[in-house]
Amino acid sequence: MQLTPREIEKLMVYTLADVALKRKSRGLKLNYPEAVAIITAAALEGAREGKTLEEVMDDSRHVLTKEDVMDGVADLIPHVQVEAIFTDGSRLVTVHDPIQ
């Protein structure tokens, strides 16, 4: 199977997000890479589902809470940016204050 660097990166994001969600379901607090992966995967999936840019940004902002992450992690993530493919083309999604 031949994958482009962008496809490999997305695959890594989805894999880490999957591992992180399993850890979260077991009650473990998430670290920085895990939190970013979950937020990023939520944005990519929202775009894939046909949501608007605004819907994706809003939905991705409510995926995690401060209780889901280790102390200080929320402060380390002022925003998350990812290029997502929407039904009308590729757009940069910026999720401000992603952990409430």
UniProtKB/Swiss-Prot annotation:
Species of the source: Photorhabdus laumondii subsp. laumondii (strain DSM 15139 / CIP 105565 / TT01)
Family per record: Belongs to the urease gamma subunit family.
Main location: cytoplasm
GO molecular function, one term: nickel cation binding
Matching InterPro entries: Urease_gamma (IPR012010), Urease_gamma/gamma-beta_su (IPR002026), Urease_gamma_sf (IPR036463), Urease_subunit (IPR050069)
Subunit note: Heterotrimer of UreA (gamma), UreB (beta) and UreC (alpha) subunits. Three heterotrimers associate to form the active enzyme.
Cellular component GO terms held in the UniProt record: cytoplasm
EC number: 3.5.1.5
Keywords, comma-separated and alphabetical: Cytoplasm, Hydrolase
Biological process (GO), any one: urea catabolic process
Subcellular location: Cytoplasm
Pfam families per record: Urease_gamma
Catalytic activity: urea + 2 H2O + H(+) = hydrogencarbonate + 2 NH4(+)
UniProt pathway annotation: Nitrogen metabolism; urea degradation; CO(2) and NH(3) from urea (urease route): step 1/1
Protein name per UniProt: Urease subunit gamma
Enzyme class: hydrolase
Superkingdom of origin: Bacteria
